[in-house]
Design a protein with these regions (language model features):
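Helicase-associated low-complexity regulatory tails and linkers flanking the ATPase motor
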Residues: 214-270, 274-277, 284
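C-terminal target-recognition/interaction regions appended to catalytic cores
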Residues: 251-502
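Flexible, glycine-/basic-rich loop-and-beta segments that form/coincide
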Residues: 174-244
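A short acidic (Asp/Glu
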Residues: 17-20, 40, 75-78, 139-147, ...
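Class I S-adenosyl-L-methionine
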Residues: 139-141, 153-196
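Conserved proline-anchored active-site loop of SAM-dependent methyltransferases
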Residues: 1, 32-35, 44-90, 108, ...
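Conserved Class I SAM-dependent methyltransferase catalytic core
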Residues: 96-164
Length: 502
């Protein structure tokens, strides 16, 4: 295709060379779109961009910004609580100063905002924006709200499609890429509530439109908002008095936890975003028995326990596809006749999913949640304390018997006594109980194998049970894992699938 005027720019010289190979008639130039010529306007005389491009902007020539910006953030936390720094651009600072909200850290939002700024600074009137990007800004709820308000007051949506991100080399095939087209329309007052996107797939011989997908700019009764409202807090535990976890048995490398942990809390639910992929493939949803490193944590108390396990089960049970990966969840109907049964399923599932990082700790930096130094109990435990004490003594597992002596039953065990469970949930619970007592006879040896994993605790969690199974494998574990999958599929089929926003 031949263009009358084609300018191509990138910050990387190698990409610039590739661009020139594909577009031999283009004017290619190295340029940091997010920072270079930042205060440029019609009256400027000193600039880095080609003079002909500056004149086109100054003279308000029709222009199409065609972009494939990078996907990343300026401060994303790694799983160990550290952050990989991406250089802060001038447009990032501009967005923060002009109230673009949380989306200011998203790189593709920064590229879009630079287009908005150029249109304003040059008082342009005939601008189109065509871009490849993620589609979270079309369905990202409160995170994207302020950015969307800025953007859609300036640009009108004209067309959009999604396709599998795997079409780009070296990119995961588990999420969608959007290609969207917008026209400048300043002072647009009718900000859209939803967008229809064509779903495109490719075969060896053709590209096919296989349907449409509607995404909602404003979340409808979001699951995440339902979980967090009303907020339940308490007396904060002093910094340094509790483990700040990145997983079941690892602490964050950060000095300060982003999630306040309160006295009396049974742990935290990590609950990032509100979409399908974040809860599964992205590791944005998991449970722990203490504080966590991330600011998306929700403390767990009796008052919000049902909400916590409901959110966890809903978000962990759906298998993501590239089409639904960015879809949001709505809140469940608590008045439904099946809600109480669902809570039973969710409670059991929350104990044994791969993201169930509940554990019990002994002699770990003196941490305590029960007024006994070095003793951090697991309120998510599911078997009667008396039975364990008796059985541990019978099997001469003195460490466990001593740990259980004089203790009391945990919250989840007591809660389960008042529930009528489905056959699928009961089967999981029965097999988990059977596995616990089978493993009990190996506990001394397991303690020697993993001396720092608190396996002397009578109220160990799922992670610790899996550790024991590594060295003392059991057929019961395989039966249990199969039963967990059946329960997970039931939750997805009978509850969670209906809560994906349509």
């Amino acid at each position: 295709m031949t263009y009358k005027k084609l300018y191509s720019s990138t910050i990387f010289n190698r990409e610039l060379e590739l661009s020139q190979d594909y577009n031999t008639n283009s004017t290619a130039f190295q340029y940091d779109f997010l920072s270079d010529d930042f205060d440029l306007n019609r009256d400027s005389s000193n600039f880095k961009m080609p003079t002909s491009l500056f004149k086109n902007l100054r003279d308000d020539k029709p222009i199409i910004f065609y972009m494939n910006p990078p996907y990343g953030t300026t401060g994303k936390l790694a799983k160990d609580g550290t952050a990989k720094k991406i250089d802060i651009s001038k447009i990032n600072l501009f967005m923060k100063a002009n109230h673009y909200g949380n989306a200011s850290q998203q790189l593709y939002a920064q590229f879009v905002t630079r287009v908005i700024k150029l249109a304003d600074d040059f008082d342009l009137t005939n601008v189109y924006l065509a871009m490849f990007s993620g589609i979270r800004y079309l369905a990202g709820g409160n995170y994207w709200l302020k950015f969307d308000q800025h953007f859609f007051k300036q640009f009108t949506y004209k067309y959009g499609m999604i396709f599998n991100a795997g079409e780009f080399s070296g990119t995961s095939s588990m999420w969608p890429i959007g290609f969207t087209i917008y026209k400048l329309n300043k002072n647009e007052n009718n900000i859209p509530k939803e967008f229809e996107l064509s779903i495109m797939t490719r075969t060896d011989s053709s590209i096919n439109n296989v349907g449409t997908k509607t995404v909602n700019l404003v979340e409808k009764d979001s699951l995440s908002s339902w979980l967090r409202n009303p907020a339940i807090t308490g007396t904060p535990m002093p910094d340094g008095s509790y483990p700040k976890l990145t997983s079941a048995m690892k602490e964050s490398k950060r000095n300060n936890s982003r999630c306040t942990f309160y006295e009396g809390s049974m742990g935290c639910l990590m609950n990032s975003a509100n979409n399908v992929a974040e809860g599964t493939t992205n590791g944005g949803v998991w449970l722990a028995t203490s504080g966590i490193y991330h600011d998306h944590g929700v403390n767990v108390f009796d008052k919000n326990f049902d909400k916590v396990v409901a959110d966890f089960a809903i978000r962990r049970s759906i298998a993501p596809t590239w089409v639904n990966a960015q879809d949001n969840f709505t809140k469940p109907n608590t008045n439904s006749p099946i809600y109480s049964s669902f809570i039973g399923d969710a409670t059991v599932f929350s104990l044994f999913d791969t993201a169930s990082n509940q554990a019990s700790y002994r002699n770990w930096n003196g941490y305590t949640n029960c007024n006994k130094p070095g003793r951090w109990i697991n309120q998510w435990f599911f078997i009667d304390q008396g039975k364990i004490e008796t059985e541990a003594m019978r099997k001469k597992q003195n460490d466990v018997a001593y740990d259980a002596y004089g203790d009391k039953n945990r919250y989840v065990y007591l809660k389960l006594q008042n529930m009528t469970l489905s056959k699928e949930a009961q089967n999981v619970l029965d097999l988990a109980t059977k596995l616990y007592f089978k493993q009990l006879k190996y506990r001394k040896k397991a303690i020697l194998k993993y001396p720092d994993m608190s396996l002397n605790a009578w109220d160990i969690g799922w992670y610790q049970m899996k550790l024991i199974d590594r060295v003392f494998p059991s057929k019961v574990m395989q039966e249990l894992k199969s039963a967990i999958i059946i329960l997970k599929e039931k939750i997805a089929r009978e509850y969670a699938q209906d809560l994906i926003e349509k």
